[in-house]
Amino acid sequence: MANIVYFSSVSENTHRFVQKLELPAIRIPLKDRIRVEEPYVLILPTYGGGHANGPDPDRGGYVPKQVIAFLNDEHNRSLIRGVIAAGNTNFGAEFGYAGVVVSRKCDVPFLYRFELMGTTDDVFAVRAGLQDFWKDQSCPQPSQLQNR
């Protein structure tokens, strides 16, 4: 089954989106730290949009501090397989930019982005996309096959 790890601030927008997916999920808490034991797709909100010169990956601030702390645990980082980001289209090129940052830093695919708490179409797209994604992940990769 698709494993989801997500962070949601006090606005609860990301939490509401994840609830609508009706898939197993673990929430990164606001204060405590957690450790995961299975591969997962990370869902997170984007912070700090609206920079005059557009996205600046070196500036920081797009990824919530709680997510940074979670991913700074090498064990947690080793299990991430993809990222989905929430954002606000008012921020133009920075819409969902936390997904770009995590994708680059963790070398995983940026799978999808949605606005605020997502639409019904977003829920269906993510649910179907995760099903396909995990199916592909469970297939042996050429590097995992032994020469006979």
Curated annotation (Swiss-Prot):
GO biological processes: protein modification process
Organism superkingdom: Bacteria
InterPro entries per record: Flavoprotein-like_sf, RNR_Ib_NrdI_bac, RNR_NrdI
One GO MF term attached to the UniProt entry: FMN binding
Transmembrane segments: none
Function: Probably involved in ribonucleotide reductase function.
Family, as annotated: Belongs to the NrdI family.
Protein name: Protein NrdI
Organism: Mycolicibacterium gilvum (strain PYR-GCK) (Mycobacterium gilvum (strain PYR-GCK))
Lineage, top ranks: Bacteria, Bacillati, Actinomycetota, Actinomycetes, Mycobacteriales
Gene that this sequence comes from: nrdI
